[in-house]
């Protein structure tokens, strides 16, 4: 067992816990299994986390941080609020290469909501995600690119509900569950409903880029 600085050891334990909790769930995973997977002894785990539940909650909190960081990187360089919102609609952490593992832990956590501490951690997680999306919708509204008929808060909830449903269905591999025979995707429909003409303009730009490369509409996010 190699010695690591405390901060790096904590990160290593969190990384290992993500995979274990995602596969076995909170109830099914044990600290003994975690210690073995991380190459440490159980007392090392308890130096960093008071209990298995404390570790599980830390993983949920880390998922929030990783999701917001991923979104910030993905939205960087967008030329206007409408494009930021369109990118956000297409950036579901539940199905992304980076996010799907950690988000399986969130789904597992939803099975443990009888525990008040886990429930509270999930509520904080969802609230942070909702606040981020709400700000993006509000900025697009202020720029005149999204209708103000509905509040940014309720539109953000709509996006989260759709994103969660998509994320749950995606692993089932139901044929064409997210697009039709013409290749139009759910994200295109959502974007047009929210952004109207601006969404159509962004879609036309994307189609032109794909056509120039000789590709297919489903080749680009």
Question: Language-model features: where?
Answer:
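Generic hydrophobic, amphipathic alpha-helix propensity
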Residues: 9-17, 34, 59-63, 67, ...
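Helix-turn-helix
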Residues: 12, 20-54, 58
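Amphipathic alpha-helical packing segments from all-alpha helical-bundle domains
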Residues: 65-68, 73, 116-143, 153-157, ...
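Hydrophobic alpha-helical segments that form the core
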Residues: 148-170, 181-193, 208-211
